[in-house]
Amino acid sequence: MIKPMLAQKVNTKPIDWTNKVFVQPKLDGVRCIFTKDGAYSRAGNEFKNVAHIKEDLIDFFRKYPDAILDGELYNHALKDNFEKIISLVKKQKPTDQDAREASNDVQYHVYDLVNEDQDYESRYNWLLRYVPIASSMTVIKNTLVESYDEAQMLHKVHLAQGYEGSILRLNKPYELKRSYNLQKFKDFSDTEAFIVGYEAGKGKFEGLIGKFIMCDDDGNEFGCPIGKGY
């Protein structure tokens, strides 16, 4: 299983602005690693309802069978309907209708190449050169910035355009962990976690799920009541 590089929060470690720093919009989509064998989630689960994207990548992986693409399943036209993207890509036995909907609504937005030997600018230029142009996919646009203030101004533009925030990419190698080579601007605090269990409800909630047990990337477990942002 390939663990993608995860972002640290910006401002938790100084950035050397004398080196190249790139900013891109932060997508509120579903993280997806694409290889010649298929499309996979952060947890290594295969996405079964992305046949239209696989079709557009057949020739690419025939030429570059060792390439590993990192991106998100997303559609900016559905930025306010994230649940629809989730519903479509999580289907394990998609019907013909599911496949048609996914073909219309789910795109692959590529933003990195899993390669621990190249800096980000080299990886990004490779993506621009070799990832096919298709209606089902795109390579995310990056902007080179020279200061925190410039990055913050661009972040405000991304928010005004309806994006979740912004991502800063340092011109350093890809790391298979949470890394300061990748940092995120957001206007609210959150954490990323997986459901690992649940506790039964009590009283009037007996027979129902009371709360989910979550586990974050550092191995910390905590409870999350239903409807509280899981």
How should these model regions be labeled?
Residues 3, 20, 66-68, 107, ...:
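A residue-level signal for beta-strand positions that form part of recognition/binding surfaces
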Residues 7-23, 140-162, 195:
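Phosphate-interacting basic helix/loop segments used at nucleotide- and nucleic-acid interfaces
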Residues 24, 30-34, 38-71, 178-230:
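Classical nucleotidyltransferase
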Residues 73-75, 110-115, 141-144, 170-172, ...:
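Short, structured patches in soluble enzyme cores that scaffold and shape functional sites
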Residues 102-103, 160, 206:
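Extracellular/periplasmic catalytic domains that process cell-envelope and extracellular macromolecules
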Residues 13-135:
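Covalent nucleotidyltransferase
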Residues 1, 142-190:
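Amphipathic alpha-helical
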